[in-house]
């Protein structure tokens, strides 16, 4: 995983009942709820600091809500094709084999190996190696996929140890 820090404005939408004396708290909560640990366009905000010494730009009324661009210092995380990650092998059935790596889900394609069911548990076989469901494995990221709200998703192949 790689990361970078940038300054920017994050747009958030506030409802009329949120425009009270607690507006700073409501803005902070809206920024965190909308952006923190959410995968957007291949990157995920891991840390957000709202700049308190910068004035807020004027809000814009949109459909009976107020859109405010909030000045922030944002630490983003992202993954590259070719990165090697380590996680837990999860076999739900023959066609759904993934590796869970925190904020990353690696999907294994059918040609990555074979799934077998023996002794009341699934096993994944690749190049003569057997990997039990729930075991720790390493994988190389092959292709970025559409992510979920709070996870990156990549096609990957297990790295033989």
From Swiss-Prot:
One of its GO terms (molecular function) is DNA binding. InterPro entries: DNA-dir_RNA_pol_18kDa_poxviral. The keyword Coiled coil does not apply. It is an enzyme of class 2 (transferase). One of its GO terms (biological process) is viral transcription. One of its GO terms (cellular component) is DNA-directed RNA polymerase complex. Its EC number is 2.7.7.6. Keywords: DNA-directed RNA polymerase, Early protein, Nucleotidyltransferase, Transcription, Transferase, Virion. It is found in: Virion. It catalyses: RNA(n) + a ribonucleoside 5'-triphosphate = RNA(n+1) + diphosphate. It comes from the Viruses. The keyword Cell division does not apply. Induction: Expressed in the early phase of the viral replicative cycle. It holds the Pfam family Pox_RNA_pol. The DNA-dependent RNA polymerase used for intermediate and late genes expression consists of eight subunits Rpo30/OPG66, Rpo7/OPG90, Rpo22/OPG103, Rpo147/OPG105, Rpo18/OPG119, Rpo19/OPG131, Rpo132/OPG151 and Rpo35/OPG156. The same holoenzyme, with the addition of the transcription-specificity factor OPG109, is used for early gene expression. Belongs to the poxviridae DNA-directed RNA polymerase 18 kDa subunit family. Part of the DNA-dependent RNA polymerase which catalyzes the transcription of viral DNA into RNA using the four ribonucleoside triphosphates as substrates. Responsible for the transcription of early, intermediate and late genes. DNA-dependent RNA polymerase associates with the early transcription factor (ETF), itself composed of OPG118 and OPG133, thereby allowing the early genes transcription. Late transcription, and probably also intermediate transcription, require newly synthesized RNA polymerase. This is DNA-directed RNA polymerase 18 kDa subunit.
């Amino acid at each position: 995983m790689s990361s970078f820090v940038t300054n920017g404005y994050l747009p958030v939408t506030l409802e009329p009942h949120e425009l009270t004396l607690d507006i700073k708290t409501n803005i902070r909560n809206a920024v965190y709820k909308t952006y923190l640990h959410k995968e957007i366009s291949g990157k995920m905000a891991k840390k957000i600091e709202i700049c308190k010494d910068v004035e807020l730009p004027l809000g814009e009324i949109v459909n009976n809500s107020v859109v405010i661009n909030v000045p922030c210092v944002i630490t983003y995380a992202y993954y590259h094709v070719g990165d090697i990650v380590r996680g837990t092998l999860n076999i739900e059935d023959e066609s759904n084999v993934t590796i869970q790596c925190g904020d990353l889900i690696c999907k294994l394609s059918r040609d990555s190996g074979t799934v077998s069911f023996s002794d009341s548990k699934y096993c994944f076989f690749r190049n003569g190696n057997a990997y039990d469901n729930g075991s720790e494995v390493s994988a190389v990221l092959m292709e970025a996929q559409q992510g979920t709200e709070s996870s990156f998703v990549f096609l990957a192949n297990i790295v033989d140890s």
